[in-house]
Structures are given as C-alpha cells and as structure tokens.
Amino acid sequence: MDVDSAVLALVWGDPARVLVVRKSCSVDSYWACDVALPGGSIEVGEDPVATALREAWEESYVHPSMVEVLGVIGVESAAKGLRRVAVVLARPKGPIDPRPSSSEVDFVGWINLDHVLGEPREVRHPRRGVVLGFELPGGLVLWGFTMRVLRRVASTVKLRLEA
C-alpha cells in the first residue's frame, strides 16, 4: 500500500458516531480550526494501522489497547494530492474517555455520521472563509478531505450494518 499518512475512523453506536478532533485554532498552522480524524504521517517502522493508533493516542488519549481495528477501508488523497492517506476503521473495545492530549488539538468529540449524508453547502470556516461542507453542532465545520473520508466511512458502516 503506497501511503504516507493514516487516520483512525473510530466508530461506535446506533446511530453511528465517529471520533473527531479539531486542530487548534490558536496555532499558526495550515490545518488550524479544521475538524479531522486523529491521524498523521507514517513514521519509520510503522504501518498505517500503527500510525493511526499512535496518532489517536497522541491527539485524543485513546489508548491502542482500547481499540479493535476492523481494517483499512481505503486510501484518499489529501493536501491537493500531495499526501496519500490510509483510512483505518475501528471501534472501541469498551468505554473510553477521549480528550485533547496535545497543544495541536483543542476539541475532541463524537459526531453523528448522519451529519455527512446530505448535500454539502457553503458554510463559513473560522480560518478559511466560505467552504463547501457541513456545519456541525458546536459550531464545528466539516469540509474537504475529512468530509470525503467521513462520507466513505458512513457508506462502509451502513453496508456492514445491512450485511
């Protein structure tokens, strides 16, 4: 698998919810104020699953031992095609207490996957201005790469529930 990054789509419940983080709005970063799945660059010696689990721990205090990995459900392009990102689908093994664990994240929470099934519309992002996406509860804005990935996750989860 030719990828350089990985994200963890940690899903639970009925209706299905997925864990997201918001990249801190108080730092000067390309990703500032973006809603994202926990994830990042693959380090030497890691595979996509190991990367996704490490990043979930680093960004949201979700310990790898509390996660059941269901598999890699696809690869998506990000950063205008410069990154190839593996999407790792998982579910919690039991109760977890996710919360921001680094200065790069200022929010961790669960969003209902039903929020991404409609048609995207123009919404105002705190840093980027008007983008095509979804306004989520709490004033979060979902758009771009994470929106595409969560639409794939929602379709995959729906198919698995119907099987």
Regions found by a protein language model. Give the residues of each.
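Unchanged
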Residues: V27, G40-G138, L142, R152-A163
